[in-house]
């Protein structure tokens, strides 16, 4: 079972919980860390792993580039929402998503990450995004470079209902950073199962005494995918667990 970076949600929550639930049906699963959604899809398609996790938009991006390999990958379940967030420098070159065009520099995460795939996929849908200078750099260090002006924006993908290291950094007093809406376009692309790749949602970026700060952002689902040759019994069991025991796989504070 190919998951995600050590200690992050795909690895430490979804992978561990799905493996535990499947063990009750007699299946022993090894939960292996990975570099993210695209890495997982490569491993599932090649048979190096039987089950993996991926963002829905990363799956669409990958399918478009691996038409033959995609025949070996089946969606067997879906988990929670993940949303595309963009942080910018207050008073900088980018004040809203309409400023994401030629002459702007954005850091979007490592080349095997879901956030990188999200941006590549969005660039194919929105022509102005395709003109933005893109850097395959992630981590808080890259976010910090937005404050110095080395980058104009930083993109990441995370659950809309829980804090993470990037949001915490943006919300830090005196960070000089701000979040922007990403809702200036309409996307109606569909997954192979007929469901939309993105839905626009309001996500809380900071909780306040009187009101919460929110941004409108495109959200995609976490999909569970499997190799089509993994065996009918095993795939049936995994699908059953995902249907009947979803809250257990998500974990008590599931994303």
List each language-model region with its residue ranges.
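Bilobed "Venus flytrap"/periplasmic-binding protein-like clamshell domains
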Residues: 1-28, 82-148
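Pocket-flanking alpha-helical
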Residues: 15-16, 32-70, 141-146, 161-170
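Structural recognition of the beta-strand scaffold that forms the well-ordered cores
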Residues: 31, 50-54, 85, 107-108, ...
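Pocket-lining segment of extracytoplasmic ligand-binding domains
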Residues: 56-58, 92, 115-213
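Signal peptide-directed extracytoplasmic domains
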Residues: 57-93
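A structural signal for short loop-to-beta-strand junctions that line the ligand-binding cleft
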Residues: 69-79, 204-216
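Short Pro/Gly-enriched coil loops immediately N-terminal to beta-strands
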Residues: 75-84, 171-174, 183-184, 215-221
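Extracellular/periplasmic juxtamembrane helices and adjacent flexible linkers that interface
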Residues: 221-255
